[in-house]
Amino acid sequence: MSPKLDLIYFDVRARAECARMTLAYGGIQYNFTDTQGYFGCDFMTAKTSGKLPWGQLPLLAVDGQLISQSGSINRYVASLVTKPDFIPKNPVKAALADALHETAQDLFRIMPIVNLWTEEK
């Protein structure tokens, strides 16, 4: 049975976009929500009350177990994709794919405003 997945983030692309795209590509069902929808309170309240591991988003709830850090989330959701060769079996090719992922993460630091667009302009 597939786990119940809740991806918790703000309504922007940024750090949750890779997980969203991977889940969509894999045809994996999940619920996208914000802190209000998942915890019943706004981000700052969730943060100050200790509901957020490391005090930040995104989070992925897997059957209620919270996973933090976008890289960890991305690698977990990639492991759920059943399409052939999505994660290379060759260790060098897998490392190259992971390096590409890390490079994409670096881009968020140098062009943050691009990651706020959520629709075609």
Annotate each PLM feature.
Residues 1-121:
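GST-like domain detector, emphasizing the conserved glutathione-binding G-site
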